[in-house]
């Protein structure tokens, strides 16, 4: 099938690579403009752009696709490229730009989207983060026929996978990226044979997954340990949960729930115990056990290695959220 592909991060690159390897003709790739990244804040190409360059694929990086928006010249050039591609369908995966109706109307068979949740749960920008943050037992991938709404299109394929107790957004992302690519290959095969069976999304069970904001990463020790541990895993690898101790902001990468209940005399955020296997911290009627953390400018370290260069003692107190 002759395709336009629109995507930006690694999640999308996995799908593009499998579509390319699967024999589909990639007539055009859309990805977001290069962004400053890293310590030097140098412009970096997206994972999708790098794949397109490596494989000689036609590429466009419009700042917007809205003909009446801030960059109408970008949108007009993109429309010319999309129409010229004469694609059978467009595959969209974590592109990051709003697709106006004119874009949806260009491909002969419309636009198919890879969404990393079991719709209608977790419509929006951050479905993987929000599923872990909420403590969901499972998530999955939905392939949908795109319409003008926010992840409201008819479902063409869906498959669930469990969320493990130790899953982070990073680990779950990798499994969902592979699953999404496989499901999209199935959907395209069905499209070729005219056997697609669209199913409308349920009106019940709709939840939204708004974009992750950095301020959300500050740990609130007044919450239960299970909630804190879920948020730590949800914000790994981005933006990284944070906690402030003696004026220094630490990144907390991994944690679980320790057995027992803290003494009522201990304030939230108090360090109860320090051992090579974990740092126990007081939460709401429960105890968080931190197992991996990082100092500013340092590396992620397990507790045993971290303690070699940082003196942590029982009785120290992490600052309260918002204090």
Curated annotation (Swiss-Prot):
In terms of superkingdom, the source organism counts as Bacteria
A Gene Ontology molecular function term of the record: methionyl-tRNA formyltransferase activity
Keywords carried by this UniProt record = Protein biosynthesis, Transferase
EC number(s) reported in the record: 2.1.2.9
Q: Which PANTHER family match?
A: METHIONYL-TRNA FORMYLTRANSFERASE, METHIONYL-TRNA FORMYLTRANSFERASE, MITOCHONDRIAL
**Annotated catalysed reactions:** L-methionyl-tRNA(fMet) + (6R)-10-formyltetrahydrofolate = N-formyl-L-methionyl-tRNA(fMet) + (6S)-5,6,7,8-tetrahydrofolate + H(+)
Mind telling me which SUPFAM superfamilies this protein's record contains? FMT C-terminal domain-like (SSF50486), Formyltransferase (SSF53328)
This protein's species is: Albidiferax ferrireducens (strain ATCC BAA-621 / DSM 15236 / T118)
The protein's job, in short, is:
Attaches a formyl group to the free amino group of methionyl-tRNA(fMet). The formyl group appears to play a dual role in the initiator identity of N-formylmethionyl-tRNA by promoting its recognition by IF2 and preventing the misappropriation of this tRNA by the elongation apparatus.
| Annotated (6S)-5,6,7,8-tetrahydrofolate binding sites | 117-120
InterPro entries found in the cross-reference section = Fmt, Formyl_trans_C, Formyl_trans_C_sf, Formyl_transf_N, Formyl_transf_N_sf, Formyl_transferase-like_C_sf, GART_AS, Met-tRNA-FMT_C
Indicate the transmembrane segments per the record.
Answer: none
Gene field: fmt
Q: Which GO terms describe its cellular component?
A: cytosol
This protein is called Methionyl-tRNA formyltransferase
Task: Write out the similarity annotation.
Answer: Belongs to the Fmt family.
């Amino acid at each position: 099938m002759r395709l336009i592909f629109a995507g930006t991060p690694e999640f999308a690159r996995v799908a593009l690579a499998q579509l390319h390897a699967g024999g589909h003709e990639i007539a055009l790739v859309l990805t977001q403009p290069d962004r400053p990244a890293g310590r030097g804040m140098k412009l970096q190409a997206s994972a999708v752009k790098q794949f397109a360059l490596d494989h000689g694929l036609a590429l466009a990086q419009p700042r917007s696709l809205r003909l009446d928006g801030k960059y109408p010249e970008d949108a007009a050039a993109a429309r010319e490229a999309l129409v010229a591609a004469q694609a059978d369908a467009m595959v969209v995966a974590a592109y990051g730009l709003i697709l106006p109706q004119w874009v949806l109307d260009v491909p002969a068979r419309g636009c198919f989207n890879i969404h990393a949740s079991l719709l209608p749960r977790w419509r929006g920008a951050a479905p993987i983060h929000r599923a872990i943050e909420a403590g969901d037992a499972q998530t999955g991938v939905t392939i949908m026929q795109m319409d003008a709404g926010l992840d409201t299109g008819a479902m063409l394929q869906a498959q669930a996978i469990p969320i493990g107790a130790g899953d982070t957004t990073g680990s779950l992302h990798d499994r969902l990226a592979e699953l999404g690519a496989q499901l999209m290959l199935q959907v395209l095969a069905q499209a070729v044979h005219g056997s697609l069976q669209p199913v409308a999304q349920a009106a019940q069970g709709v939840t939204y997954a708004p974009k992750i904001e950095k301020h959300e990463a500050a740990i609130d020790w007044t919450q239960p340990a299970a909630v804190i541990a879920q948020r730590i895993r949800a914000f790994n690898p981005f933006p990284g949960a944070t906690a402030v101790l003696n004026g220094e902001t630490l990144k907390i990468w991994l944690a679980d729930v320790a057995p027992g209940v803290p003494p009522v005399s201990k304030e939230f955020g108090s360090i109860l115990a320090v051992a090579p296997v974990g740092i126990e911290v007081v939460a709401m009627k429960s105890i968080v056990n931190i197992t991996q953390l990082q100092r500013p400018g340092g590396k992620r370290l397990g507790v045993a290695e971290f303690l070699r260069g940082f003196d942590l003692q029982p009785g120290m107190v992490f600052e309260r959220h918002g204090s």
